[in-house]
């Protein structure tokens, strides 16, 4: 009976070892495998050509004006020159505001006596 149980134990042990060995082998071979090429190459849909193919524009130019034409075609687009309105400076604003304050009797801004350094020290 002992011989049968030992043989059974050793057989189950060998089967377990064989299973782990196969699993390890499969794992190692998967690490070293390369990706197979697809059986059929992928075909991309062909881009249909337009019904009316575009023809390049042909410029007829004198050799003297060639440089000007090339610069005009390859250069930056020309911008329209728009004159900017002059900015109001603080001097202009002060002139406008001082005249309005001078004629407004209810405005306290018309009194410029507080700008004197002697008057500032009293505050």
UniProtKB/Swiss-Prot annotation:
Among its keywords, does the record have Transferase? Answer: no
Q: Record keywords: Nucleus included?
A: yes
Show the ranges annotated as biased composition (Low complexity). 97-108
- Swiss-Prot/TrEMBL keywords: Flowering, Nucleus
Q: Give compartment(s).
A: Nucleus
Q: Where is the composition biased (Basic and acidic residues)?
A: 77-94
InterPro entries the record matches: VQ, VQ29
Q: According to the UniProt entry, where does the motif VQ sit in this chain?
A: 66-75
Q: Where are the transmembrane segments?
A: none
Q: Name one GO biological process term.
A: cellular response to hypoxia
GO CC annotation: what is one?
nucleus
Q: What ranges does the record list as Basic residues composition bias?
A: 33-43
Q: Where is this protein chiefly located?
A: nucleus
Q: Which residues does the annotated region (Disordered) include?
A: 24-55, 77-123
Q: Where is the composition biased (Polar residues)?
A: 109-123
* Remarks, miscellaneous: Plants over-expressing VQ29 have delayed flowering.
This chain's function reads: May function as negative regulator of flowering transition.
By what name is this protein known? VQ motif-containing protein 29
UniProt source species: Arabidopsis thaliana (Mouse-ear cress)
Its taxonomic placement starts with: Eukaryota, Viridiplantae, Streptophyta, Embryophyta, Tracheophyta
